Amino acid sequence: MSDLATLETSILDQVAAAGDEAALEAVRVAALGKKGSISALLATLGKMSPDDRKTQGAAINQAKDKVTEALAARRDVLKSAALDARLASETIDVTLPLREAPTDAGRIHPLSQVWDELTTIFADMGFSVAEGPDIETDDYNFTKLNFPEGHPAREMHDTFFFHPKEDGSRMLLRTHTSPVQVRTMLSQKPPIRVICPGRTYRIDSDATHTPQFHQVEGLVIDKHSHLGHLKWILHEFCKAFFEVDHINMRFRPSFFPFTEPSLEVDIQCRRDKGEIRFGEGEDWLEILGCGMVHPNVLRACGIDPDEYQGFAWGMGIDRIAMLKYGIADLRQLFDSDVRWLSHYGFKPLEVPTLAGGLSS
């Protein structure tokens, strides 16, 4: 029994001294393997008398269990130490300075920048963004917006129509984002307060027009909205967008099928050596159209005009981008010229914010 105790102590000391899993495995094989020291003792039990076998067997198995437990405990310690060492060797110093961005990094397109700017401004006023498909029905693009049959906008020379269907109806590329207003009024109950930015299409191409362009429209429907509210919203938007503390606006009577009364809006400006300065001078620039939503439009969208009223406006995102950032030709916005974009574009990490000033 004393020899067994000595063997047990020796093996446990070897387990404790094992410096890695390979050394620990060698100790296990030497003690518990087929030819191991404890396995050899277990093999002698068959030659003992029944009484000795009972006594020696219990002692040998107890020693085997202690060695097995010690091996498992040491293996856990070694695995934990190995993991700690690996983590220490792979540590990343997060205090290292950032690498400078390459000079040829991409730029944010002025249209994307202006889109973000106006969305931020109107969101600050409580507006949400509504979207709709570019391919629309004649009903949503014209009929529900009070365009009469024979209106010039419904002709082939102004609008991109698809081939007629078997029933005679025609799909088209939307000529404005007003169909999004229609879809909103059909799907939501008042009060409604949305802006509708998106791509629009018309058959036109020159320095100030392209077949595909961008618009943003706004819509407010409730029981008490009036032109005074519309004027305030547009005034606050223009001040924030053009970054001036004061700006004069001029509202002129106009006509749109979907609003009554209809107005066009000019803003005060001064041309100075090729630049346009807003909020001063004696010149005026037209920037948008607006008005009170026509009762026929409300009825077509399932809203009772005797209970609800509202106003809408629309402006070209491309146009206000040109005015703000001094872009002379609308077609340059769509030329995919890297040199032009490197001049007019915005660095991704230097995006203007409403709080910090909209221009870089």
UniProtKB/Swiss-Prot annotation:
InterPro entries: aa-tRNA-synth_II, aa-tRNA-synth_II/BPL/LPL, Phe-tRNA-synth_IIc_asu, Phe-tRNA_ligase_II_N, Phe_tRNA_ligase_alpha1_bac, Phenylalanyl-tRNA_Synthase, tRNA-bd_arm. Keywords: Aminoacyl-tRNA synthetase, ATP-binding, Cytoplasm, Ligase, Magnesium, Metal-binding, Nucleotide-binding, Protein biosynthesis. It is an enzyme of class 6 (ligase). GO terms for molecular function: ATP binding; magnesium ion binding; phenylalanine-tRNA ligase activity; tRNA binding. One of its GO terms (cellular component) is cytoplasm. Its EC number is 6.1.1.20. The keyword Nucleotide-binding applies. Mg(2+) binds at E260. Binds 2 magnesium ions per tetramer. Its main location: cytoplasm. It is found in: Cytoplasm. Its cofactor is Mg(2+). GO terms for biological process: phenylalanyl-tRNA aminoacylation. Transmembrane segments: none annotated. It catalyses: tRNA(Phe) + L-phenylalanine + ATP = L-phenylalanyl-tRNA(Phe) + AMP + diphosphate + H(+). Belongs to the class-II aminoacyl-tRNA synthetase family. Phe-tRNA synthetase alpha subunit type 1 subfamily. HAMAP family: Phe_tRNA_synth_alpha1. NCBIfam families: pheS (TIGR00468). Tetramer of two alpha and two beta subunits. This is Phenylalanine--tRNA ligase alpha subunit. It comes from Bradyrhizobium diazoefficiens (strain JCM 10833 / BCRC 13528 / IAM 13628 / NBRC 14792 / USDA 110). The lineage of its organism: Bacteria, Pseudomonadati, Pseudomonadota, Alphaproteobacteria, Hyphomicrobiales.
